[in-house]
Each structure stands twice: as structure tokens, then as C-alpha cells.
Regions:
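C-terminal beta-sandwich interaction modules and adjacent acidic
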Residues: 1-300
């Protein structure tokens, strides 16, 4: 908990523990005994934003362009020695808590989660109510956490263009999905259509899910690639004939983890999901074709 671990007999409990944007939570602050010599007590609602930044040198134009383009994330290696994971507190609202004759004995405070709230996850944000008590002795700093879950109603969903991230397009790959929104723990289903622009060698086809975090800190230098994670590549077929004028449709089903972090945007970073299809030609000189299509993942 870093700085916020000096509880000194004070506890913060938030209920309900799981909430959606636009719903209200209440923090209850209790103390083992009255806290004396108090000059001020506050409770601040907000979230801790997790992100990466570049601590050495400056990000060049290529790195900045890559960070701005979600379809490039994970494609280019970065200098890991010059980038670090970090976190910053983003306060939303702060309230003064009552103190009487220099003593603090506890309080309650309610908070309505904003409509724009990013969902809780280890990849993006941790929501909390933070207690700070200033006193003549040792100050008290502690927190109570709660989880914000996200449904499709909480997000603006737009159909972003599919992007080619590898190959020359000798065979066009199109990822067709029944929906752009998928829920954590449920499968991602779809079809990949292969359309050769001329006769090509047979192909091996695979698909996987992935998510990336775009780094855009207010003050620090953005990391070149933010963060990136992908699922196992699902092999869909080998020896698939690629002949001009004969498109091939290949269905797929991917398992989405139950703890998949929801799509979201915070002050210092943004989390974006996608499905990527990759195809290898039997003749290695013909290379590889890769495309990505952005999706939205929710967990409520």
C-alpha cells in the first residue's frame, strides 16, 4: 500500500464492494479508540492509475506514433531498461470529516461513481476511498478499496477499421464478428475470410486475443509501447488452399478469461482489446499476413 499504510487503528470499509458507474458507494471509517491531537481529517475518493513511462532519454517520433496507434502495440521491441511501471493517484472528490475538540472517532461518506469511471483491474485502475488524518503525533493514512465493473451500457462502442499489421496483402484477411462487445469469461466467436489476390501457396492460419495499454501520462514521458498481453494462438488449419477467385471462410472460438480486464480509459493510460489473425504461407519466401480488429471487453 506504499505511503497509505499508516492506519494506526483506523479502518476504511466501502460497501457495496462491487459497483457500476453511476451507482453509489458508502465508506465507513472506524477507529479502535478516539484519535487525539487531530487538526484535520479528510476522505478522498478516486483511483490509482497503473501505467508505464520512459525515465531515460526522450521518446522519438516513431515511438510516439506507435504509442498513439493501438494496432502497432506489441509489434516493436522497446528498450526495457529505460521504461518502468508506475502508478499515480487520481483524486475525484475530497470531503472534510468532522472532528470534535481535536478528536476523531470515525465518519461515513457516500460517493457516486462517475459515468466515465474506468473499470477496476491490475492493468489500469484501483478504486479507493483514502483516509488522511493530520495530527500532533503520527499522521494516519489508510484506504478502503472497491471494484468498479463495466457493462456495455457504460462504454461508447465504435467500430474501428481493421488494421493490417503484417504482410503485403497478397491474401486479404477479414475478421468477421457477430458483435464488437464480449464479456469476460465468455467465448469470442467469429469467422476469418481469406481472399487471395492471386494464386498463392497453401496456408496455416491462427488467431488469438490480446490487449494493450496506451501510455499517455500528463507529466512523464510516455512509454513507447505501454503494456501488452496476449492469449495463446489458436491454430485453425494447415494446408488451406489459396486460389484466386476462391475465398475461404474459417470459423473460430476463443476463450476469454473470466478475470479479463475491461476496456477503459484513465488519465494516464488506456486499455484496448483486439483479435489478431495471422497466416503463414507454405512457401516461406511469401511471408506472413497479419490483421487486427479492435473489440470491447466488459465484465458486468
Amino acid at each position: 500500500m506504499g505511503l497509505f499504510n499508516r492506519s494506526a487503528g483506523a479502518q476504511v470499509t466501502v460497501a457495496p464492494a462491487v459497483v457500476r458507474p453511476r451507482q453509489t458507494v458508502t465508506a465507513t471509517v472506524t477507529t479502535d479508540k478516539p484519535v487525539d491531537k487531530v487538526t484535520a481529517a479528510t476522505l478522498e475518493w478516486g483511483y490509482t492509475n497503473f501505467y508505464r513511462y520512459r525515465w531515460a532519454g526522450r521518446a522519438d517520433s516513431t515511438a510516439v506514433e506507435m504509442n498513439d496507434a493501438w494496432w502497432l502495440l506489441g509489434e516493436v521491441g522497446t528498450d526495457a531498461g529505460s521504461e518502468k511501471d508506475t502508478e499515480d493517484w487520481v483524486g475525484v472528490t475530497k470531503v472534510d470529516l468532522p472532528i470534535a475538540t481535536g478528536e476523531f472517532t470515525g465518519a461515513t461518506s457516500s460517493f457516486t461513481v462517475p459515468s466515465w469511471a474506468p473499470g477496476s483491474s491490475d492493468a489500469l485502475a484501483r478504486w479507493s476511498a483514502r483516509l488522511s488524518v493530520e495530527r500532533g503525533g503520527r499522521d494516519i493514512d489508510t484506504r478502503g478499496d472497491f471494484n468498479v465493473v463495466i457493462s456495455a451500457d457504460n462504454l461508447h462502442v465504435s467500430d474501428e477499421p481493421q488494421r493490417r499489421v503484417g504482410g503485403d496483402g497478397e491474401t486479404e484477411l477479414e475478421i468477421i464478428l457477430p458483435s464488437l462487445v464480449f464479456r469476460a469469461g465468455q467465448p469470442i466467436t467469429g469467422t476469418i475470410v481469406l481472399t487471395p489476390q492471386k494464386d498463392m501457396s497453401d496456408a496455416e492460419l491462427g488467431v488469438y486475443w490480446g490487449y494493450a495499454t496506451l501510455s499517455h501520462p500528463l507529466e512523464k514521458t510516455p512509454a513507447a509501447a505501454g503494456g501488452y498481453k496476449s492469449g495463446d494462438r489458436l491454430k485453425l488449419g494447415k494446408g488451406i488452399p489459396l486460389r484466386y477467385g476462391a475465398p475461404v471462410s474459417v470459423p473460430f472460438t476463443l476463450s476469454l478469461p473470466a478475470d479479463a480486464p475491461p476496456t477503459g480509459s484513465a488519465v494516464h493510460s488506456t486499455l484496448i482489446w483486439f483479435v489478431e489473425a495471422s497466416m503463414l504461407y507454405a512457401k516461406w519466401t511469401q511471408g506472413i499476413e497479419k490483421v487486427r480488429r479492435q473489440i470491447v471487453v466488459v465484465n458486468a
